[in-house]
Amino acid sequence: MSEPSTIPWTLRRARPSDAEAFARMMQEHEVFRQLLQLPFPDAELWRTRLSSQNAPTSPELHLVAEVQGEVIASAGLHPAATQLRRRHVMALGMSVAVPWQRRGVGSALMTELCNYADNWLGVLRIELGVYADNLPAQALYRKFGFELEGRQRAYALRDGEYVDSLMMARLHPHPPRWAPAAPTAA
């Protein structure tokens, strides 16, 4: 493959057939160490997960960035909770293969996910967790209106050390409004 900055990527919905590509990307130490993933990912588990996300009634959207048929990044929105009173909230997750980090792929994925949440799902709140030492990811999220809401100390074990996680969220910048019809004469 050529130099990453010279090849355009395309975005599309993730498919169950991407499972092997997800497993390969998640084998990259610098990728999975920034997520809650474990080493040695299983392609069949990814296939099952991607199949459920593509169900016609699922509000989830899982996108991939692809170059010459190879998945180089993924990002998705999924319900943050099962409680009905939190159905206005989606959680966001993202991973980008190391050679493609800091090349605009994350921004392209974020643009599409925010558009989907804002204009097609009516999501009021998108939330995420990011490790406190992942400064490039934090900068990307801030660029899209995410704000720091809190810190979870010793949140996860990573490479033999406990690391903190920052909770960030973005509220819909212009929530949809409803203009009720004028009352009719009875």
Question: Language-model segments: which ranges?
Answer:
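Conserved GNAT acetyl-CoA-binding A-motif
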Residues: M110, D118-G129
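A short beta-loop-alpha structural element at the N-terminal edge
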Residues: T10-R24
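Conserved acetyl-CoA-binding loop-helix of GNAT-fold acetyltransferases
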Residues: R102-A117, Q138-K143
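Conserved catalytic-core motifs of GNAT/GCN5-like acyltransferases
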Residues: R125-V130, R142, E147-V163
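Hydrophobic alpha-helical core bundles mediating ligand binding, dimerization, or RNAP-core interactions
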Residues: F22-M26, E30, W46, L50
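Acetyl-CoA-dependent GNAT
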Residues: W9, P16, L35-P99, Y116, ...
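Terminal substrate-recognition subdomain of acyl/acetyltransferases
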Residues: S2-E3, M94, E161-A186
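Amphipathic alpha-helical recognition patches that constitute DNA-binding helices
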Residues: A21, A91, R125, P136, ...
